[in-house]
């Protein structure tokens, strides 16, 4: 089996990261302006991050959100005051695409409307609804074109 060809790959294989820097398999150092889809913006191998992840993995790596998870409750309680929206409800997702798709679904449930406005040239992820909201025919399958999306 081989990997699905989603993107044209750059001829560079990072094997190590520290702070804002990456090293490839040939030892070439790069200043990393990417940050992994904005999920590692504190830098690579940050000691606090590594310690907290290691601590959690030594207890349990993952479990369903269908059971009580005090860490999720603690996160919600901390995010409220930090964001200025303490009365909001937190809905945790695995990816930006999943967050975008669920935001559209929640808006539709709330308003009863089906039509969605999306920006020309925007990219929202690779789940079905996120692709439908992305104005890029190269990634849209016929099934993605059934959504009620108007591009502005």
Predicted regions mapped to residue ranges:
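PLP-dependent aspartate aminotransferase-fold enzymes
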Residues: 77-152
